[in-house]
A protein has these predicted regions:
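Accessory nucleic acid-recognition modules appended to NTPase machines
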Residues: 79-167
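Conserved nucleotide-binding/hydrolysis micro-motifs of P-loop NTPases
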Residues: 10-14, 33-37, 167
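Conserved small helical "lid"/interfacial subdomain of P-loop NTPases
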Residues: 31-53
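Structural recognition of the conserved hydrophobic beta-strand(s) that form the central parallel beta-sheet
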Residues: 3-9, 30
Length: 167
């Protein structure tokens, strides 16, 4: 009896296309970035960072937090010195491969601008209507449904996660 593990970053390939190829005999396991606690453990810090007492410990945790929010929490990043190159490579692969090429998008400016505006608005709610208006203000003719589709492609590719407003 053999066990074969197939890994990849493309959510659609793993969930939709592989299903027919493997005849339904597969398990999808999503691996997410570290939580801050996991990140500290991976960087050889105390597990219970809330109990740090010394000024040095507080400074170390603050430094780790700054790294966490600046570079993210991919498990591989703990071992990589040039984090920006690694992250840019992931971005280019996901952006160009999983979003632009796979979905046959010709207006990549709109996708870049949507992603930029979402990143700039990370601390406050942002609606599809607002994103559409921002794009229109730059002279880009795009409909709300297209914006919704583009954000969906980004979500499918795990480039971003959305939170729904249920109020």
């Amino acid at each position: 009896k053999y066990r074969i593990n197939i890994t990849g970053s493309n959510s659609k390939m793993l969930s939709n296309e592989i299903a027919s190829t493997l005849g339904g005999r597969f398990v999808i396991m999503n691996i997410y970035p570290y939580s801050f606690s996991e990140y500290l453990i991976a960087n050889h810090m105390k597990k219970n960072y809330l109990d740090v007492i010394s000024t040095k410990d507080k400074a170390d945790v603050q430094n780790q937090y700054n790294q966490y929010v600046t570079y993210g929490a991919f498990p591989e990043l703990t071992e990589i010195n040039n984090k920006r190159v690694f992250l840019n490579s992931i971005y280019q692969t996901v952006y160009l491969g999983d979003i632009i090429t796979r979905n046959k998008i010709t207006n990549d400016f709109a996708v870049r601008l949507i992603l930029k505006k979402i990143a700039e608005s990370i601390t406050k709610p942002l609606s599809f209507s607002r994103l559409t208006n921002i794009l229109k203000s730059t002279g880009t003719s795009i409909g709300k449904q297209t914006v919704i589709n583009y954000v969906g492609y980004m979500t499918d590719s795990y480039l971003l996660f959305t939170l729904q407003n249920y109020a």
